[in-house]
Curated annotation (Swiss-Prot):
Region ranges (Domain III): 140-188
CDD domains: UBA_RuvA_C
Pfam families reported for this sequence: HHH_5, RuvA_C, RuvA_N
Gene transcribed to yield this protein: ruvA
Transmembrane spans: none
Record-level GO cellular component terms: cytoplasm; Holliday junction helicase complex; Holliday junction resolvase complex
Keyword DNA-binding in annotation: yes
Assembly and binders: Homotetramer. Forms an RuvA(8)-RuvB(12)-Holliday junction (HJ) complex. HJ DNA is sandwiched between 2 RuvA tetramers; dsDNA enters through RuvA and exits via RuvB. An RuvB hexamer assembles on each DNA strand where it exits the tetramer. Each RuvB hexamer is contacted by two RuvA subunits (via domain III) on 2 adjacent RuvB subunits; this complex drives branch migration. In the full resolvosome a probable DNA-RuvA(4)-RuvB(12)-RuvC(2) complex forms which resolves the HJ.
Organism (species): Sulfurimonas denitrificans (strain ATCC 33889 / DSM 1251) (Thiomicrospira denitrificans (strain ATCC 33889 / DSM 1251))
Domains as described in the record: Has three domains with a flexible linker between the domains II and III and assumes an 'L' shape. Domain III is highly mobile and contacts RuvB.
Family designation: Belongs to the RuvA family.
Protein name per Swiss-Prot or TrEMBL: Holliday junction branch migration complex subunit RuvA
Locations listed in the record: Cytoplasm
Sorted UniProt keywords: Cytoplasm, DNA damage, DNA recombination, DNA repair, DNA-binding
């Protein structure tokens, strides 16, 4: 299972990108949200690897929350990767969480390819879905803090000291957060 790709952006279209990873070029389907946020030559995408009888497809996302939303959507009967990607293209994970919390069937129907029956099914199937999960995973700072906290715990630091140190750090990148927190933890 391929869960992520990092490499050089070879080409970029609204629905897919080609990413060169160590000499192998992968075609990765992306949402319009990810397409508009892509910049630069180097790209890192969280991916969902969908294996069908006739194809193996990669769907890529800049945000972990968008990937979690996509993977939850394709588990719904009648919602395939194309419809799930259309939802991810229409709404950010936090916007879709609001739609779910409000049970807004007309907002779901605004997505191309979704009629009233499918919209109702999506709202029913996702009624117990933890929208906080996709919102928190979409915020890079909170994701980086969680990863940094995990790394520091594996080094043997106590959770309360880790929380205190990370609370004083301002970085958004996991590696920089760990470095800053380590400096602070040495003084505590």
């Amino acid at each position: 299972m391929i869960v992520g790709v990092r490499g050089v952006l070879v080409s970029k279209e609204p629905s897919f990108v080609h990413v060169d990873v160590g000499g192998v070029v992968y075609e990765v389907f992306i949402s319009l949200q990810s397409f508009s946020a892509l910049s630069g030559n180097e790209v890192k995408l969280f991916t969902s690897h969908v294996i069908r009888e006739d194809a193996q497809l990669l769907y890529g996302f800049l945000e972990l929350g968008e990937k979690k939303l996509f993977e939850r959507l394709i588990k719904i009967n009648g919602v395939g990767p194309k419809v799930a990607m259309a939802i991810c293209s229409t709404y950010t994970p936090s916007q879709f969480a609001v739609v779910l919390n409000n049970k807004d069937i007309t907002a779901v129907q605004r997505v191309p390819g979704i009629g009233p029956k499918s919209a109702g099914r999506i709202l029913v199937e996702l009624s117990g879905f933890d929208t906080e999960l996709i919102i928190s995973a979409s915020e890079p700072k909170s994701l980086a803090v969680a990863q940094a906290s995990e790394a520091l715990e594996s080094l043997g630091f106590k959770k309360d000291k880790i929380s205190k140190a990370l609370g004083s750090c301002s970085a958004v990148d996991t590696a920089i957060l760990v470095k800053e927190a380590l400096k602070l933890l040495q003084t505590i």
